[in-house]
Amino acid sequence: MNIREMLEKIEFDTLAPRAAKSAETRGRDRDEPEDDLRPSYQRDRDRIVHSKAFRRLKHKTQVFLAPEGDHYRTRLTHVLEVTQIARTIAKSLRLNEVLTEAIGLGHDLGHSAFGHAGEAALNKLVKGGFDHYRQSVRVVEVLENDGRGLNLTVEVRDGILKHSKGEKGELLRRRPKSRALTLEGDIVRISDIIAYVNHDIDDGIRAGLLGENDIPKDIRTALGRTGSERIDRMVRDVIAATLACDYDAIMMSPEVLQALEELRTYMFQNMYLTPTVRGEFEKAQRILTMLFEYVTAHPEEFFGEKNEEPVERLAIDFIAGMTDRYAINLYERLFVPRAFV
C-alpha cells in the first residue's frame, strides 16, 4: 500500500458517510496515472495554487478599484478567506477538507479585472453574456497550461461552476438538482457570501463609506456586532443546521439565513450600488469596453494570424484574464497621449 492509498483509506475510516472520497471521484476529462503520494483532490488543489490564473488574483479587485491602502481585500485575499471558512465547516462536519479547499481556491479564477464592474462590462459585450463562474471553469478546462487546462476532477469543476449567487440568487439551493454534486461544493457556496459580506463591511468602514453601527440593529442582533462575531455565528449555524438535518444538505437556520439575506441586500443598497462605488465602476467598465473594441478590431496585434477561436472569444479570454494594473497600463498605452518632450 503506497502513501496515496493510505490517505484514501484514512478518508473512508474517518470521514462522514456523505463526504466525497478521493478514491470515488467521477474522474477527469483525460485519464491520468494515479500519483503514489497524493489523492485526486489534493492534486487538483496543487494545480490550482500553481496556476498563473491563481497568481493573478492578487492584482484583481474585490470591491475597491486599485486601493492605495495596504489592508483592502483583493480577489486573492477574498479567495483565501472563503477557503478558510469553508475548511472550518468541512472539518467540523467530517467532510472532505481537501476537496473543499480545492473548490474554494479555484472558485474565482475566471473573475475579470475590476471585480463585478468588469464582469458587468463583459456581460454586455459578448453574445450569450459573461459570468465569472463559467469563465472560471473555462480557465481550468481550456486556458491554463497552454490550452490544455488543468484536467481537474469533475467534483472540483462542478463546485467552481455552482458557487455563485449574485445579488438576488438563492444562498442555499432548495432544489436538489440545482445543488453541487458534493456537500463540499455547497459549503464553498455559502462560505463565499459569509466571507464577502463581512470583509466588504470591513473595507467599507476603512474607506469611510460605512460605520459599524450603520448596519441595522436587527441584523446585528441576529448575527453579531463585529465581523468576527458574525462569521463565528454563521459558521456555527451552518454546522448545527447541517447536522440537524442529518447531512441531507448544507443548511442554515431560518432566522440566520433571513438575517444574512437582509445583510446582503443592505450591502448592495448601501455600498456596492452607492454613487461613490458606482462612479469608479463606470470608469472601469469604460476601460474594458474600449479595450474590447480595440482588441476585436486589431486581433493580429494580440493573437497572431493562426487561431481557430472566434475573435470575440479570444478577446474575452484575454481581457477577463487581465489584472487591474495590466488593463490600466494597456488602456494608457493605447488611448492616452504621451508627451514627446
Named regions from a protein language model:
Residues 99, 103, 108-149:
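A generic, well-ordered mixed alpha/beta core segment in the N-terminal half of proteins
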Residues 1-79, 83-89, 96-97, 130-341:
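Histidine-centered, transition-metal-coordinating active-site segments
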